[in-house]
Structure formats: structure tokens, C-alpha cells
């Protein structure tokens, strides 16, 4: 109880004390208040009044810490007392709180509130409460430098900037936006910036920046540096053309800015140049303008701005003036030294430089390259190795550049003069100690006198030396710099010459090494050099090195052993720059340092990780078994980073894998495995190789070699050996067969020839054959095919084209045949083949023979192909009847009347053509020309019948003596004499394939003319027979009188030969000529009374010529005429069968006396005046046999042309016309004279021969080329009126008249026969 009372008393006492304190406003804990500047804040202070009773009066005081008097006092209702700093902003809030408006940073601090009760006593120390006011404010400058501040160049300046704020701001300095930090140039501390050593680069704007979390404050100050101007925009190099304006700019800055600009050209004021001051202007901004620039204005221009402070700066630029090339100061005389090289120089001035310089000498262009020893240099000068007098002259040059030229130079005369020469030469070397005197002599002479100068090669010497007037070089005191090479130069207007000497100064320190080279690696450097002159003493070297970024005091010295001139420096840092230099020293001192070489050591190679290479194995390996081996195929890897280089194929038979091929191309996808063992199980796998990386193996493919057969051996060409063997065997078999066939053919041919040699030569025969005009063999050449066709015929060739079977004569008919016909029939049993045309030969005619009986008549026997038939009479020829082959001639018209007509001949008559030979050349005309007396005859005016031999119809209108379209040979007759139409035998190409021309066709019946096949197909002979002569009316000598015939009034065509030269007689014949038989007696001519008229025979002579349709006829040679063969001998009165198949009467003539005194009767006579000296060939044995008088068969030569038309059959429309041939000229004839014309015994007749003058082949050779050959021609006329009769009696031939000669060529039977060597004939006169 007592405790409870004590506690209650204590609590009452406590409560009473607390109430007393509250009532007095006492607070012990301070209060913190924060506000932002510019805002209002309340500082609280509470007053507690008693619960009961009236509140006592009190006074409120607010104190700020640091202010001795209250800033705010309030009592009762009286107005408050406010400190002036708070006036308008402080007021009482509530009972005792203080309200501050628009607080400032200065308002921040501690505030104390006191409440004084007027009715109580209390301790003032304990009375009151505290409040701390915090004001947050952005920075504000309390101190800043001026906006512009000046400083002298070279001095220092400090700029201070102070800022206040809550929290306290941080102050920094910036220049042109760049933060400045403390360095050697700038010092920054507590908002102050100090700039030392002010320069022009320090000028500009400086910024003070104060910042805190409440914001920032910035202040800028411009620093102006007082000093000389600074060039902001210097001038630049420009290029202008001549006569243009140039503009050079220059802009400078300075403080103070009273700038003036001055321009200089080549360090001289532009206004001081006389030629330039009138054309320049300087603008206020410093720009220089040059008007109408000239080439002389080019150069360096300098801009100098100034403001009277310090040293003015300068900036330079170059002006380039472009202009065409020109020549300046061309000397009037050019001196060129004699004996040494010299120069002809052209002083060219051009911008851009000249590209071409052309020279003129004496007004003509000079081609420098054509002068030996002259060279045109790049600058346009001419270098002459050794000038001669040829170089003398006046020279001008014309330079060109891209802008052209200003013209040529002034003329300069070249003068040759002797060059200067040295009279005293310096020595090769001079050695002298340093500090001593030295004199080096040198003297020269020349015209003009040369000037001598001395120069040091390389670095010039700065020692005391001079050149004496005599030319010598004098050193008063030698120094180290005088060491080296010196040259003495003698110069005049001609040229300059030099002489060299070497000066060695001993007793000095070494010279600096040269050519320092450094080769580095990552940690080493190899330093090498070339030693300089040692000064006369032994020298050593040391290498100095340092890092490039170190200072000049960081050089390290490395000694070099005695001898070598290199040093390997190691322990270097990779990828670091080092500097090296070499120093030499001897007993007298050290040399200068060599040049400093800076190098960088190599860096360590950067180790880069190897790229991930993805190598996958090949896919889908398969094995296909074949008979030759195993075909392995696969697919390339699915993913691979690099191209596949190759594949590796492996195989195994057991457990071990072996390599089959390791070079399979990467582009292949298959492999063929061969040469495998039989009955073995193989397993294969493939691997891919890419850049030395091998993939994993592919899948395994297994195959058995049970059915695999080894591949056959192949050759290098890929053929199997059995195939190759078969090919070789086939080739060998064919070769053997060809060889055997060739040998067999040769053997058979040889046997055939032997049989032919053993047989008696049968008489020639004529076969009818029709050849196509379009045959390719008609071009004048004998092809090998035609010759082969004409060889000895076979049975098949004989029967071809002859459908009728052979007919045997009845016994009665055989008994009626005479002995001669039986013999002829036996001989004619020999078979002949006929050459067929390639295109149109349809059938061959039977072989028929014509012969002459003992009575001199021509008889015809049957051939084996068809029986003999009775001949029919021919209109106009009562002595001839038509037989199987040719008309048979009799002495009366009643003999041998045989009404039978051969069927084969009748069938072939319309098909016969006059052109059958494959050659187009001509043979001589026939040997005899029947000519009727030109009396007043009455005959038919035209031909009305059809030509059976040619298949052409004669037009009904008469065409007397018209020229054919193939024969244009005009006759030449005497004045007043009308030439009769010609009567020539048509030409034949080859007797092997020719068709006989037909005589005039009459109503009594036609007849055909067979061809003459050469026996056994052999070639025609080129030999000729002797010529025969028949005297004519006014052209024969007296012994050759014209006989009169009693049958002059008959009506028949007149036949004659012209007296002109035939175009076949050109080349001289070298063939043997058979002799004429003299033993045959002439027979009297039996002429019926009704014969139409007299016939005169002439022997015309033709000359070689081409086919009339092929071109102009060449002129005949003046000499060397052919001798022509004679016809077989016939008795007088008989009708001789000519080549045209008609009867010619043999006329009797008186026998003239033989030359040489040989008289007596003679059967034939020749005019000896027709001969020229010509060798007489000896006849071959075969020809002699043919000329025997016992043989009486005559084979007539066929013709290609019809005797009626004188033109070949062709596709031309209309009938061919008659043509008159030119009269042949006289040639060589047979020497013997005969009183009558005879016919030679039968011989192989051929008119084909080589006609070229150079032909010297054997008689058996036939012409296969297009050379002309002799062909006889025949001309007919159908009107026998209008021929004037020449006066009777002999008359000497007129000058220019020619005698007609015919010739026939015998043909050897075999190819192997050669004619005997010719014998020279007797020379006969040709005049008369």
C-alpha cells in the first residue's frame, strides 16, 4: 500500500512538471526541414496553454544561427519585427511557427524559436526549440572572367570561375568544346585556368562550366592573342594558258586586325617588276590577280600579311603558264668537235615539255636515223659520234608539244672545229698530310682558248682552295673535307673536256661509314655498312641503337669486332621500332655518325584456329560384275568444305585392306577393277581426299569373281589382238591375191604376144562403127580407156552388138569363090573389135575385107559374121558395084553381078557417122586427087537423095562451092582460072576407131564405109609412105602432059584438089618410108565410052593444123615438108579405089628421063623440083614386107567427115556445106619418076601421128595428148558447070603455085617394132 501511494505521488509530481514545460513551449529535439530555392517553407514552433484558466501573454522570437538579434519578433497584437533580409518573406504561422517565402540559398541554416511567457519565470538557456533549414539550389557563378580577355603572345594568363549551389557545384574548363586538364600548357585548380606561354594556337573561346545534381551553369570567355598575323588560307599552285588571267588567294587573321598584304614574285615585290606591275592587282582580302599572263610570269609567288606586331608570316604558291613549244636563243653558229662526239642542240622552251623536235638541214627535212652515228636525244638534240664534212650545213629545228609550236628556230650554221685539249694533265692520285699545302697542275689549250675550272665529285669542299690562272688547283692547308675525287674541266664554245684525279688526305679521323642496311626478324637485326676512309690509321666500328620513341639520350653503343663490317643485334622486342647508326673511330678520333636507319621488327605470327573441315565419306558404293572385271560406282560425299582432289579405292580378300588405286580423279564417280583372281570374294571401299584430309571409308561392296573372265589383250589402239590378227591376215591375203593376179595377167599377156608374133600378119580391114558426137573422147586426146578398149578383143567383145549368129557359106557358094577370095576369107577369119562410144555406141558392124584380084579389080569377100552378097551398081560409076564393105571395081559393068545385099550393112547404113575418132586432129589429105576436065558438062543441080553414111539430108537448093562450117581453106588459083571445088579425104583421128566417109548418094542405092580396126588393138604408126605426084594441066613440067580422054561428055560430078597448102604438113616426119615397087607393069585403062569426062590427078600437100572448128590455122613452115606414102600400084585404065570409097582411073603418062642419066621405062615419075634435102629413113622389116609387090590388098583409110558435106555430124540444124581447101605448097617428093600412077601393095595404113615438131618417139607410139595429127579431108561438088578449061599443054608453074601431094601413114602391127634409122635423101632443086 505504501508502494502504491509512493508511485502515485511520484507520477503526479512528474505530470505537473511536464505540463509546466509544455506550457512554456520547451522542446528538446531539433527539426530538419528541406526546401528548394524559390519555394515557401514553414518552420514549426508549438505553444501549449494550460487546460483551465486564461492563457497568459507571451512573446515569440525567431533567431537564425549566426545572427545576434532575432530575425522575427511577435508580441500580442502588435506588428512583428522582421529582419530586412527577410522583409516581405517572413511571417508568423499559427501561434509561433515561422513562414518563409521565396527561400534563397542564403536562408539555409539553423533557426531557433523562443516563446516567453510574461507571468512565469524560466531559464532562458533551456527555453526554445531548433529547426535546420536546407535550401537545394542549382549552381550559380559568383565569379567569372570577362567575356574577352587579351594576352600577349609568349606570356601567361589566369581565368577564375567561382560557382555556388546546393549541393556545391563542380567547376571545369573547356576550349572549343574540348575539356582541358592539367598539363604543361594548361593548369586547372578550384575553378581557375592558367595558360602559360600563350601562342596563336591558344587563341579562341574558353568555357567555364559549373554543374551539380540541381543543374549547371556555363560561362564563356574569348582569349585574344596579340601578335603577328596568322595565314588561315594560303595560296595554291595554279596552271593557266598563255594570255589568260591568274588568281592567287591569301587570307590571314591577326589581333589587332589591321592587316596589310604584300605579294612577291621570286622574292621580289610584284610592283617592282617592270613588266608585271602594270598587270597585277592585290585585293583587300589578300587576293592577287595577274592579267594576261605571259610565259615569263611563271614562277613562285609569296603572300606576306602584316599588322606591325612581331614577325609577319608568309605563304608561297607557283604559277605555271602553258604555251606552245618555242626556241629561245638559237646560236647562229654551232660548233661541233672533230674526232669526238658532239651535239647539235635545240634550245627548246615549252610547257608542257616538247614531245617532238624536227630538224631541217639546208631547207630540207633531216632524217636523223638515216645518218650513220647520228642519234636524236630525248631533249631534241642530235648526238654525232664523229662529225665529218657531211654534217656541214645550216640547221633549223621546230619543237612541238601538246599545244603545238611557235615556229622554227633561227638558222644555225654548223662549223667543225678541233676540241680543246689538255697540255698538262693532273696525276692519278695525290697523297698529302692534313694541314699541308698542295698544288695539282692542269692546263689546256684550244680555239678558242678554253676556261679551266675545278670541281669536287660528290659533296663539295668548304676548305680553302682556289684555281690558279694557269689552271692548277692550290690547297693552302689540306683538311679532311678535301679528301676525295676532283675533276679539272676545260671548256670553250666547241665542247668541254675533263681530267680526274684522286686526293688522299692522311692523318685525319676516319670518315663516316656509308650505305647502312638493316635486315630484321622478330627479335634480331643484322646491321651492315660500307667503311669510309680510315684517315691513314686503323679504324674500328661501333653500332648505336635505341628505340624510336626514346629520347636522344637513350642511344646504346654496341662494339663491333675488328675486321667485319656487320653486326647481328639480338634480344629485340617484336613489332617494335628501332633506330641504328654506325660510328667509326681511330687513334685520331671518331668519324661522324652515319645516317640513322629506322626499322620495325617483325611481329609474332597470329595463330588462327584452323577452320573446321567437314569430310564425309563417299556414298552408295556399288559393284557390278562384268566379263572383263568389276565396275565400281559411287556418289560423292554429301557435305564437304573443299573440292575433292581424288579418291582412294581399297580392296581386301582376307582381313587386310590393300590399296587398289590412290589417284582416281575427284570428278570421277566410277572405277573399273580388272585382272582379278578367279573364284575369289572381293570387298571394296572408297575414300575421298580433300586438301590432305582423308575422309572416312564408304560402305563396303562385295562381289565374287566366279564368272569374271580376263579381258582380252588389247593393243595400244584399243583393238583386241584376235581382231588385229584378222585384219592383218586379210590385208596380207588381199596383197597376195593382187600380186598373183598381176603376175597371171603379165604371164597371159606375154603368151598372147608370143602367139601373135608367130601368126602371119593379116591384111587390115575396116569395120563400120557409129560413134557419138558427144563422146568425151572426141576432144583430141586418146584416153587410156579407149586404148584398153582397142586391145586384142575377147569373145564377149566380139559378140557384143552382133545379135546375128555366124553363118556358114554353102558348098556351092564356096566353089564359086576364087582362090584369092578363099585366101582372103581365111585371113579375114581373125576377129576384130570395135571401140564403142561411152554413151551412144549401140552396135558394132561386121568385119568386112576389101582386096584386089590378080586382074587388078577390087573384090570383096564375106566375113564370118554374115554371108557374101551380090553387089549393086552405083549410080555414076559403072565400074563399081556395092558390096559388103566397099564398092568393088571391075573392068566392065557386067562382072560379078551379085544381087545379094548384106543385112547387117543395110541395117547399119543409116547409123554410120563420119565422126568416130576420139581425136580431133587432122591427117594429111589422100594421096591422089581425081579431077574432071572442066568442060561444059550438064549434071544434076543438087542432091536429092538421103545420105545413108551420115544420116543427113542434102538441102534441095544447089550450093556450088560453098565453104563448110568446119573447113575454111580458100583455094589460090591463077588469074583467070576458076578453081574447082575441093575433093579431100576427111580427117581421121585414129584408125582404131573411125568411120569411113560416104560418097555421093544416088537413087541407085547407098553404100556404107567400114572402119579400119588396128590389129590386136595396137597403136597407129607414125611412119609415112613416099609422096606421089600427078601432073596437072598448067602446073606440071613438060614431060607431064595432060592426056585427052574420049569420055569427056558424060555427066558426072567434077572432082579436083585445090592448089593450096594443107594445114597438116608442118612437122618433119622421121618415120621410115617403104620403097615403091618398080616391077609391076602398067595395065591399060579400060574406059567405057559413056564416062563423063577426063580426070587429071594432082598430089596436093597439106600442112599440120588443128581442127577447123577449134581455132586459127597456124602458118606452115617454110621448109621441111612431109613425104607422103603412095597408093598401091594399079594398071592403066583401072579404077583405083581411094580413101573415099570411089574409083579413080589410072592414067598413062609419058616416061620422063630420070635424073642422073638413068633412062629406061618407069612406072612412076616425080617432079624433082618439089624436093628439099631430107633424110630417107630405112624401112623396118615389117614395112618392107608390106611393100612387097606380091601383095595386092588395099585397105582404105576411113574418114570422119562425109565427102559430100565436108563437115562432121553434129546437133547443128541444117545440112553441112561444101568447103574449098587451100592449095598446098610443094614439098619433098619421091625422087623416082613413073609414067603412070600406081598403087602400092597393101600396108597397115594409119593417118594418126604425132604432129609436134619436137616429137621423136618411136613409130609405134600414138598421140595421147591434144597435139594435132594428120587427117585427110575430101570435098565434093554436085554441079559440074562453069569450070573453065585451062589451055592444053604443059606450062611452068607460076610463082607461088603449089603442087598437091597426098600422104598415107603405114602403121606397124606391134608396139615393139622400131623403124630403122633414116638415110639422107638426094637433094633436089625446088625452083623452076
Swiss-Prot record:
GO cellular component: dendrite; GABA-ergic synapse; inhibitory synapse; neuron projection; neuronal cell body; postsynaptic density; postsynaptic membrane; postsynaptic specialization of symmetric synapse
Protein's membrane topology: Single-pass membrane protein
GO BP field: homophilic cell adhesion via plasma membrane adhesion molecules; nervous system development; positive regulation of inhibitory postsynaptic potential; synaptic membrane adhesion
Topological region Cytoplasmic: 744-1328
Molecular function terms, GO-annotated: kinase binding
Topology Extracellular: residue spans: 21-722
Residue ranges with Low complexity bias: 990-1001, 1246-1273
Secretion signal span: 1-20
Omega-N-methylarginine modified-residue sites: 1136
Disulfide-bonded cysteines: 45-113, 161-208, 250-303, 346-397, 442-488
CDD domains per the UniProt record, alphabetical: FN3, Ig
Residues covered by the Ig-like domain: 30-115, 139-226, 228-320, 324-415, 420-504
Keywords for the protein's UniProt record, in alphabetical order: Cell adhesion, Cell membrane, Disulfide bond, Glycoprotein, Immunoglobulin domain, Membrane, Methylation, Neurogenesis, Phosphoprotein, Postsynaptic cell membrane, Repeat, Signal, Synapse, Transmembrane, Transmembrane helix
Tissue: Detected primarily in brain, including cortex, hippocampus, cerebellum and striatum. Largely restricted to inhibitory GABAergic interneurons (at protein level).
Description of post-translational modifications: N-glycosylated and sialylated. Not significantly O-glycosylated.
Biased composition (Polar residues): 1018-1033, 1129-1141, 1199-1214
Principal subcellular localization: membrane
Glycosylation sites: 241, 258, 624
Modified-residue entries (Phosphoserine), positions: 775, 783, 794, 1207, 1215
Region (Disordered): 758-817, 914-1040, 1107-1328
Task of the protein: Transmembrane protein which is abundantly expressed in interneurons, where it may regulate inhibitory synapse development. May mediate homophilic cell adhesion.
Quaternary structure and partners: Found in a complex with MAGI2 and NLGN2, where it interacts with MAGI2 (via PDZ 5 and PDZ 6 domains).
Stated family: Belongs to the immunoglobulin superfamily. Turtle family.
Protein name per Swiss-Prot or TrEMBL: Protein turtle homolog B
Naturally occurring in which organism (per UniProt): Rattus norvegicus
Source lineage: Eukaryota, Metazoa, Chordata, Craniata, Vertebrata
Gene it is expressed from: Igsf9b
